[in-house]
Regions:
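Short, residue-level hotspots on alpha-helical faces of the histone-fold
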Residues: 20-24, 28
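Hydrophobic residues in beta-strands and at strand termini
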Residues: 2-3, 50, 98
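Short acidic/polar alpha-helix capping motifs at helix-coil junctions
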Residues: 12-14, 24, 58
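Catalytic strand-loop segment that frames the active site of acyl-thioester-processing enzymes
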Residues: 1-14, 18, 119-135
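HotDog/MaoC-like acyl-thioester-processing domains
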Residues: 55-56, 67-135
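Hydrophobic beta-strand-centered segment that forms part of the acyl-chain substrate-binding groove
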Residues: 27-63, 67-74, 87-93
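Short capping/connector residues at structural and topological boundaries
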Residues: 12, 18, 53-55, 112
Length: 135
């Protein structure tokens, strides 16, 4: 539930708070797959876009899915949804890197993605790939 301490000066969910929760959700999703929280290191938030205001008293939930893997990187698409309507209110992508907990150096994670479940997941994967194309 969105409380007063989560708000910005406009009276809506503060983006920094939304991003913090998005990163936490991403970490939980990856940790469930990878299994070693000590071996995960946050690398980047690629975007976090609001599609509608999130207001005090709104009940929301985050839903994340791994949409891209590199040798050591793992990218998650996270959506922020309205609990009552399931309407997407915001979304973003974050990337973590698998590391050796003792050395902090990147190590292969071994995560292999299944085939996309639907066209929406295909779009999410394509968007995630676009963040890694050399410009």
């Amino acid at each position: 539930m969105i409380r007063m301490e989560h708000l910005n000066h406009h009276g809506n969910l503060y983006a920094g708070q939304g991003i913090e929760w998005m990163i936490e959700n991403s970490f939980i999703v990856i940790n469930c797959e990878y299994g070693d929280p000590q071996g995960l290191l946050y690398k980047n938030t690629h975007k976090f876009d609001f599609y509608s205001s999130v207001n005090p008293g709104d009940i929301v939930y985050y839903e994340g899915l791994i949409v891209r893997t590199g040798k050591t990187s793992i990218t998650i698409r996270v959506g922020l949804y309205d609990e009552k309507t399931d309407i997407l209110r915001a979304e973003g992508f974050t990337t973590f890197v698998s590391v050796d907990p003792k050395t902090g150096k990147p190590v292969p994670h071994g995560i292999v993605l299944d085939e996309p479940a639907d066209e929406e997941e295909v779009r999410w994967r394509e968007e995630a790939d676009s963040y890694f194309k050399k410009k």
